[in-house]
UniProtKB/Swiss-Prot annotation:
<dbReference type="InterPro" id="IPR006203">
    <property type="entry name" value="GHMP_knse_ATP-bd_CS"/>
</dbReference>
<comment type="pathway">
    <text>Amino-acid biosynthesis; L-threonine biosynthesis; L-threonine from L-aspartate: step 4/5.</text>
</comment>
<comment type="function">
    <text>Catalyzes the ATP-dependent phosphorylation of L-homoserine to L-homoserine phosphate.</text>
</comment>
<feature type="binding site">
    <location>
        <begin position="89"/>
        <end position="99"/>
    </location>
    <ligand>
        <name>ATP</name>
    </ligand>
</feature>
<protein>
    <recommendedName>
        <fullName>Homoserine kinase</fullName>
        <ecNumber>2.7.1.39</ecNumber>
    </recommendedName>
</protein>
<dbReference type="Pfam" id="PF00288">
    <property type="entry name" value="GHMP_kinases_N"/>
</dbReference>
<keyword id="KW-0791">Threonine biosynthesis</keyword>
<keyword id="KW-0067">ATP-binding</keyword>
<dbReference type="InterPro" id="IPR013750">
    <property type="entry name" value="GHMP_kinase_C_dom"/>
</dbReference>
<keyword id="KW-0808">Transferase</keyword>
<keyword id="KW-0963">Cytoplasm</keyword>
<dbReference type="GO" id="GO:0004413">
    <property type="term" value="F:homoserine kinase activity"/>
</dbReference>
<dbReference type="Pfam" id="PF08544">
    <property type="entry name" value="GHMP_kinases_C"/>
</dbReference>
<dbReference type="InterPro" id="IPR020568">
    <property type="entry name" value="Ribosomal_Su5_D2-typ_SF"/>
</dbReference>
<dbReference type="InterPro" id="IPR014721">
    <property type="entry name" value="Ribsml_uS5_D2-typ_fold_subgr"/>
</dbReference>
<keyword id="KW-0028">Amino-acid biosynthesis</keyword>
<dbReference type="GO" id="GO:0005524">
    <property type="term" value="F:ATP binding"/>
</dbReference>
Amino acid sequence: MKKVKVCSPGTSANLGPGYDIFGLALSKPYDTLEVEKTEQGITISVDGEKAEEISTKVDENTAGVVAKKMMEDFNIESGIHIHINKGIKPGSGLGSSSASCAGVAFALNELFELGLSKLELVKYSSLGEAVAAGAPHADNVAPAIFGGFTLTTSYDPLEVLHIPVDIEVLVALPNIQVSTKTAREILPKEIPINDMVNNVGKAAGMIYALYNNDLELFGRYMSKDCVVEPCRANLIDGYDEVKEKVKDMVYGITISGSGPAIITIPKKEHVIDIENIFKDVWNCPVYYTKVGPGCYVEEIE
């Protein structure tokens, strides 16, 4: 095997009350990565969405950091070239950096037949997130590897729970800049016990809803975060307006990750109406898609 091409999905993290825990893999948008064996070293090329803003230096690129660590740990002596085609806009709130991290970890596991488990791939993938977010975290890379719905319940040791789900979502991507760093810095360092009780209760209810195929309950609780979303809503112009306009057309709506992407669980009969509202307010791309699989191989040479 000389080269492998993989698809790595966009993801939505938090989903309301599941801050830094819940994650959902999307069928679209997605990145494609090609990893090819070379004689020595690691080289990176990027095209697609905002490619000009993405560093190709190994230590400054999320995929490069993951690849370097894996190759050191497994004493891989050959080199590799990583080509990333960005289908997921960086800074969108749809796990763009995570797709690169997860995609390269998955590709290296295939290319060099390392035999790593999905949990081990999540662990390596999360290391690359430190480049984008300042610290390793797994709420996006976990669904990118596992697919479906994931819960990252512990980091020491790393524990990820996976629930296969069949849900359709409608995602808006406003053309608004939201810094992940800023979106984290504005969050409270302490919260009232009542807010904790609310969020734990709603998060638990979402899991119950998944196991009972209750979209209405899942969406209603997804919309009830009282800690993170209220802080971040002001970073996304028009969000409160949109939330009010679509409230009877969706089972649930919330900010995807740190934003600006907005994720909804739409009522099927209102999908077109919701899309029109998104476009009227934000004039932005909209994705109507299913919850998707994790990374998968598209081509092998």
